[in-house]
Regions:
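Amphipathic alpha-helical coiled-coil/heptad-repeat segments
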Residues: 2-20, 28, 48-49, 61-65, ...
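Extended, amphipathic, non-transmembrane alpha-helical segments
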Residues: 30-42, 93-103, 258-268, 272
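Nucleotide phosphate-binding site architecture
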Residues: 48, 279, 292
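Amphipathic, heptad-repeat alpha-helical segments used for oligomerization and assembly
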Residues: 241, 245-248, 262, 266-286
């Protein structure tokens, strides 16, 4: 380009075509932007490679990990709730059996009943005690529903806190054991059905003594050797266990609700970082599509300008 009397004139050359070079550069850039826009819209992601937003991608990766851990914690809580529901169902069944035992004992006290009648009651009475024991031995996916002895091998005491293998730790945050924990106790059903002696229906039953949960027929108590008061205490003990179970279930349900809300908020935050704005990106796509076509047309036009120089040579 030369200046003649204040006027700029474009040189006409054969070896170099500046207009075509600039048009080619613009075509390359517009095609690159067009491809990037197509990739964002097809993937639904604003960040398709680290170069798009390195900082945002790093934050998104941490949020995604937190979301995964939160969902895992929710799954664990749901399994714990299932454990508690099965446990409560077993406690309900145990309560019905104890209630039936009390009824049989009361029926056996009828002076109009013969020895044969009482023996018939006793047959059912002894059989139900074995069913009670079967309930105390129930498991959930291989995990015992109820506690039997302490981790040290000693007897547990009903109404007192249990430790060790009788407590299941449920982690209720995405931080694992560094976060909040709910302790799910294995109810001391065996202790609730065990008393110090047949002459004393002790309110604070212990895990060693006389039990109405018989491991076999030989260990069962005869109907005439126990009083109705024992069943009253046993029912009160089971009611306490169900109350403890219900309290833990309520806490776990609140923990699950909190985690679900937290997961939703984390996903929303991650979406704001990673997800593409379809309206904005569609506008950009249309823009770069037009520019690419225009650049291609102008490149073709620029490539014809050197024909003028050839005409001058002719």
């Amino acid at each position: 380009m030369t200046n003649h009397g204040g006027l700029f004139q474009m040189s006409l050359t054969i070896n170099t075509n500046p207009a075509a070079i600039r048009a080619s550069f613009n075509l390359t850039e517009n095609n690159k932007n067009l491809q990037a826009s197509l990739t964002r819209l097809s993937s639904g992601k604003r960040i398709t490679k680290p170069a798009d937003d390195a900082g945002g991608l790093a934050v998104s990766m941490k949020l995604s990990s937190s979301i995964s851990r939160t969902k895992a914690a929710i799954s664990n809580i749901q399994n714990s709730l299932s454990f508690g529901e099965v446990q409560d169902g077993a406690l309900q069944a145990g309560a019905r059996i104890v209630d039936r035992l009390a009824e049989l004992k009361s029926l056996s006290l009828d002076v109009m009943k013969s020895d044969a009648d009482i023996e018939n009651y006793n047959t059912e009475f002894r059989s139900l005690q074995q069913q009670l024991y079967a309930i105390t031995a129930e498991t959930f996916n291989g995990v015992s529903l109820f506690a039997s002895t302490l981790a040290t091998g000693g007897a547990i005491t009903f109404g007192h806190a249990t430790t060790g293998k009788h407590t299941i730790s449920v982690f209720t945050s995405d931080r694992g054991n560094a976060g909040s924990v709910v302790s799910l106790n294995k109810s001391a059903l065996s202790a609730a059905l065990t008393f110090k002696s047949l002459t004393n229906a002790d309110q604070e039953a212990t895990g060693s003594g006389i039990t109405i949960a018989a491991v076999n027929s030989g260990a069962a108590i005869d109907i005439q050797n126990i009083t109705v008061s024992f069943f009253t205490v046993a029912l009160e003990n089971i009611a306490t266990l169900r109350a403890e179970n219900g309290a833990t279930m309520t806490r776990l349900q609140f923990a699950e609700d909190h985690l679900r809300l937290s997961s939703a908020n984390l996903e929303a935050a991650n979406s704001r970082i990673m997800d593409v704005d379809v309206a904005t990106e569609s506008t950009a796509l249309a823009k770069y599509n037009i520019l690419s076509q225009a650049s291609a047309a102008m490149l073709a036009q620029a490539n014809t300008t050197q024909n003028t120089a050839l005409m001058l040579l002719g």
